[in-house]
Amino acid sequence: YIAEKVKQSEFSLSQEEIRPYFPLPKVISGLFAIVERLYGIKVQEHSESVSRWHDEVSFYQLFDADDNLLGGFYFDLFARSGKRGGAWMSGFQSRYTYAEQNHEQLPVCFMVGNFTPALDGKPSLLTHDEVLTLFHEFGHGLHHLLTQVTVSDVAGVNGVEWDAVELP
């Protein structure tokens, strides 16, 4: 609250005035471009190939530079009736190797937000704080998805104390 008031006072700028500069589709494509540049991984949408609990939920898969599947994630980014408030990442399935069957279970996670949905054919517009939230939760998702640890109890964020998970 105070920080927002200082921004308004010092810079005559509010979060609401910034929204038009952050349409969600462009923020997501920019986020994916950064991830590809930094980590050499590609993010591809595959929403139609999986079951989803709501039409606004999307599903993506991550691939390395050699097109090997690394894992997948769901984006459930919009507020709706009956949905818990806030933003978070939850691991659904951790990386795990079944040595006896020579099989590797790939990680899957959910990244959840409560952004304002698109209205009247116009895209969802984010505040700067919401952009930061999306990047923050996506960072947790990458931690879960890109782990090389193959024991699910300690793979990704599972092996990190909760107070340390939020340090970055």
What function would you assign to each model-found segment?
Residues 1-114, 164-165:
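Active-site-proximal, well-structured secondary-structure segments within enzyme catalytic domains
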Residues 20, 24, 123-131, 154-158:
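Alpha-helix N-cap/helix-initiation motif
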Residues 35, 117, 122-145:
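Active-site recognition of the HExxH zinc-binding catalytic motif
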Residues 79-82, 120, 151:
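A short local loop/turn or secondary-structure capping micro-motif enriched for an aromatic residue
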Residues 145-156:
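Glycine-rich phosphate/pyrophosphate-binding loops
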Residues 150, 159-168:
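Post-HExxH zinc-binding segment in Zn-dependent metallohydrolases
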